[in-house]
Regions:
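Transmembrane alpha-helical segments of polytopic membrane transport and secretion proteins
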Residues: 1-12, 242
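Transmembrane-helix boundary motif in ABC transporter permease subunits
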Residues: 1-5, 68-100, 117, 173
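Amphipathic cytosolic juxtamembrane alpha-helices at the membrane-cytosol interface
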Residues: 2, 65, 89-97, 154-187
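Transmembrane alpha-helices
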Residues: 10, 15-22, 144-147, 155-156, ...
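Short membrane-interfacial helix/loop motifs at transmembrane-helix boundaries
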Residues: 20-54, 204-209
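Membrane-interfacial helix termini and adjacent extracytoplasmic/periplasmic loops
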Residues: 35-37, 44, 109-139, 170, ...
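Glycine-rich helix-loop "coupling/hinge" segments at transmembrane-helix boundaries
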Residues: 35-41, 200-228
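Single conserved hydrophobic/aromatic residue that forms the stacking wall/gate
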Residues: 236-244
Length: 244
């Protein structure tokens, strides 16, 4: 009985730790007062002010565009990489998988600084393009991680049978292989999309002047002082328990 009660208390404390910051943001985003210490009544004017802020809206557009484009390109490259690795010998495939996993094992700040130095050495102009390339780079391993297990579950005999029956390689791939790996591809795309939306550190090191995502824009605004509409903006970008 005591053990069960202790477990419930422990679980309750975990949920409080996870959700208390989000609840605080929700309350403050509806507070009519500009000060955090005083409750000035219920209002939605900060949400209206948020959507009237052109800089925030531009940052939102940049964030969504980066997430969609990087996820699509990373999914395409990652899927092709999985198909290529599946035809390799086991030793070569293991080595390549190890190399592919390095970006996931690295601290984000290491990846961000490395990419920044690479772009500087290449003389690249920092902006939307450098952020997009960076997001594609760190998203590809997550796509491979999602697609590769589906590739390993494939029965090569079905693909070979389709070829023996006169199907072209392209037709056999899209009719036999693609339907089986599609769940992994979709999972990889969603993972890449989420990681891109969630990223701050790598974006911060590879963005140019005048180009912001929601995370970097919020960081810039908070340094100037927290405006009430920032609570509303933070609510949309608040971390889930997965991030915590």
């Amino acid at each position: 009985m005591i053990k069960t009660t202790a477990q419930k208390i422990y679980l309750g404390l975990i949920f409080i730790f996870l959700y208390a910051p989000i609840v605080t943001l929700i309350v403050l985003s509806f507070n009519a007062s500009k000060t955090r210490a005083k409750w000035g009544g219920f209002t939605t004017k900060w949400y209206a002010a948020l959507f009237q802020n052109e800089q925030i809206m531009q940052a939102l557009w940049n964030t969504l565009a980066l997430a969609v484009l990087s996820a699509l390109i990373a999914t395409f490259i990652g899927t092709i990489a999985c198909i290529a690795m599946q035809s390799m010998k086991r030793t070569s495939r293991t080595i390549l998988m190890g190399i592919t996993n390095i970006p996931m094992l690295n601290a984000e700040i290491v990846t961000g600084i490395s990419l920044m130095l690479l772009f500087l050495s290449l003389g690249a102009k920092f902006g939307f393009g450098t952020i997009l390339l960076s997001h594609i780079t760190f998203n590809i391993p997550y796509v491979i991680l999602s697609v590769m297990p589906r590739m390993k579950q494939l029965n090569p005999s079905t693909y070979e049978a389709a070829l023996d029956l006169g199907a072209s390689q392209t037709y056999a791939f899209f009719k036999v292989v693609f339907p089986d790996i599609l769940p992994g591809i979709l999972s990889g795309f969603l993972m890449a999309f989420t990681m891109s939306l969630d990223d701050f550190i790598i974006t911060h090191f590879t963005k140019g002047p005048g180009v912001d995502t929601l995370s970097t824009k919020i960081y810039t605004e908070v340094k100037k002082g927290i405006k009430p509409e920032m609570y509303a903006c933070l609510l949309y970008t608040s971390p889930s328990p997965r991030d915590a």
